[in-house]
Amino acid sequence: MGRPRKKKFPRPSPIPSCLPAEQGGESVGPRVKGRLVMKKDVAVIGVGQSSFVRGYEGSIRELAFEAFREAMRDAGITQKDVDASVFCSAPEYDKQRSPAGVLAEYLGLIPQPTFYVESVCSSSSTGVKVGYSMIKSGLHDVVVVLGFQKMSEITSAESQERMGRGADIQWEAPFGTMMPAYYALYAQTYMAKHGLTHDDLMGVRLKSSTYGVINERAVYRKAVKPEDFKQGDPEAKLAGPVAWPLRVGDCCANADGSSCIILADAKKAKVLSKKLVWILGIGAASEAVNMAARPDFAKGLSVGYGAAAQAYKMAGITSKDIKVAEVHDCFTIAEIMAYEGLGFAPVGEGKQLVREKATYKEGKIPVNVDGGLLSKGHPIGATGGSQIRTIVLQLRGEAGPMQVPGEPDIGLVHNIGGVGLYGNVTVFGR
């Protein structure tokens, strides 16, 4: 008998990335007197975040409590009002196994049901999607979603190795591939095919530092100048090579931190709180973990396109309706690719937004005006929740010195897990 033939499994069709909403056409939602009518089923009634730091001295219980306390006070509720909780982190960094049960007990959230969610860097935005679904199902009315991560207990080298496990540990990680190297592949492709330059990447970091300086909870609050990227200058600490073409200044700052988002169904939300921000649309997508299985590096991360298309369609809007956004800028190239995936710029033209400074606070589409992951910091499990907190505060007009002018009414959060393995896009409105 001959050897059995290998079955060929067709590659699944990608989520369409060219829906009208993504192209920035007209909003598809219903309107009354020219204003978009928003579907308001699930609201954010409370947000909280710890400071993002390196070398947090307390336990994960204490770290989680910082964000939880602020969110509960913000919502004006007590533990008795909460009927379920979702905890989120990247388990590679957790010494504590089954952290959801441990934290739920510490925060006074038992015997209510508690759940644990992980999707690497997008864990807490995935947790919000889970919490949203729990409420929409009718099973729960008020859900706490808490993301946390304590990353500074190990060396930077060990941290990179663990983060690399978020990619393919069988075919890629054993050969030394780590997160900077993966994103460097995208940056190389963008330079070769789209004319991206080192100055474009630097421009992203210059913007992030502009707002990191004024964000009291950011881990990196130093001003960054072009001279900091000067090659060959021993004083230019951000110019050191990491994975060509990415330099030290192109990489985000890992940190210890926590974030907390409290969700409620419409009926309960209107009773509990007067400062409501609604979830208008949620999109999520996934991609092959192995980089060799990806079809085209020149179009960036496919999950961004797919998740955005879903979220825009659900909200009945287009990219033109977004007034302020938080995107996943783990590396400078990641922010530029996010512009394109969200429809803020055509494929290959994200760099133009950097050159025109269109994503500054006073620009056409303000992005990451809290410093982003590059300056605010990236405690993996807490990142998505922190992004959501920023957008909620923006829509309430409570963002202080980071407030975008013009009273924004629709905001967006774009959160990526791994090297585009998971993608979440969530649209919020007043």
Task: Spell out what each predicted region is.
Residues 93-102, 291-296, 329-352, 379, ...:
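Short glycine/threonine-rich loop-to-helix capping motif typified by GTGT followed
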Residues 118-149, 181-215, 261-268, 379-399:
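Active-site-proximal alpha-helical scaffold in enzymes
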Residues 34-61, 169, 173, 203, ...:
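Condensing-enzyme catalytic core mediating Claisen C-C bond formation in acyl metabolism
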Residues 89-143, 150-182, 222-253, 285-287, ...:
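Conserved catalytic cysteine-centered active-site region
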Residues 34-122, 190-200, 207, 219-230, ...:
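Conserved active-site "lid/cap" helical segment
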Residues 20-27, 31:
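Short Gly/Ser/Thr- and charged-rich N-terminal loops/segments
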Residues 44, 79-88, 113-119, 143-148, ...:
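Beta-strand segments within the central parallel beta-sheet cores of soluble alpha/beta enzyme folds
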Residues 2-3:
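Cationic, amphipathic, low-complexity segments that mediate targeting or membrane/lipid association
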